[in-house]
């Protein structure tokens, strides 16, 4: 047979180099997406010795979901609301700013926090952006996903996986919503 015959099967083996290029490409998406991910914690005047020793904090991951002109709105777990009166949000550049709770839903376990835009430094403003949210109705089993934030119980985690299910419905006292399941492992208290 002549070289390059159209009937020859195409070698679809994924080489180590191909795999590394895929991971590098995915990490470029991670670096951009991280600009919209924050850490929300209860403000404390006491030092958190446990967090300093272990790297594990009592913060939750959040997503910058909107800019209403006056403040940035951040969607996160409401678990940091318990017994707290003040909150802080740490942005991707490592700076922290005072936050307030705009809305809290104990049934779903989520809250919306806000940070005044006029408090942000120019450096922070240039380092962040409002997350681009997709359409969950278009998510399909087998689609690739990336989880960011407190995915494994510590801050600044990155995990890759696929959507394993789009059929699950979570029931709450006041309704239900669809849940997109992934094969990304988590840990107790993870909020990425």
Model-found features: residue ranges?
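N-terminal targeting leaders that route proteins to membranes or the secretory/organellar pathways
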Residues: 1-49, 56, 86, 120-121
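A conserved glycine-rich beta-strand in the N-terminal activation segment of trypsin-fold
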Residues: 18-28, 44-76, 96-98, 130-132, ...
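Active-site substrate-binding loop(s) of clan PA
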Residues: 28, 64, 100-102, 120-154
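Terminal peptide-recognition signature
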Residues: 35-40, 62, 71-76, 99, ...
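Short conserved beta-strand and strand-loop elements enriched in small hydrophobics
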Residues: 40, 85-93, 143-150
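Short, conserved beta-turn/loop elements at beta-strand boundaries and strand-helix junctions
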Residues: 45, 57, 67-69, 82-83, ...
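Catalytic-histidine neighborhood of serine endopeptidases
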Residues: 67-109, 117-118
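Active-site region of chymotrypsin-like
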Residues: 117-131, 159-192
């Amino acid at each position: 047979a002549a070289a390059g015959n159209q009937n020859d099967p195409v070698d679809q083996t994924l080489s180590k180099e191909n795999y590394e290029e895929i991971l590098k490409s995915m990490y470029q998406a991670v670096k951009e997406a991280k600009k919209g991910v924050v850490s929300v914690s209860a403000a404390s005047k006491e030092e958190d010795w446990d967090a300093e020793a272990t790297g594990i904090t009592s913060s939750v991951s959040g997503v910058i979901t909107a800019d209403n002109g006056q403040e940035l709105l951040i969607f996160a777990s409401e678990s940091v609301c318990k017994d707290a009166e003040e909150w802080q949000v740490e942005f991707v550049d490592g700076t922290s700013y005072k936050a307030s709770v705009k809305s809290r839903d104990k049934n779903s376990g989520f809250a919306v926090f806000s940070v005044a835009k006029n408090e942000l430094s120019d450096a922070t403003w240039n380092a962040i952006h409002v997350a681009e949210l997709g359409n969950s109705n278009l998510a399909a089993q087998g689609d690739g996903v990336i989880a960011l934030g407190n995915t494994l119980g510590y801050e600044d985690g990155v995990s890759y996986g696929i959507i394993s299910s789009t059929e699950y419905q979570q029931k709450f006292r006041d309704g239900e919503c669809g849940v997109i399941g992934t094969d990304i492992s988590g840990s107790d208290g993870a909020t990425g």
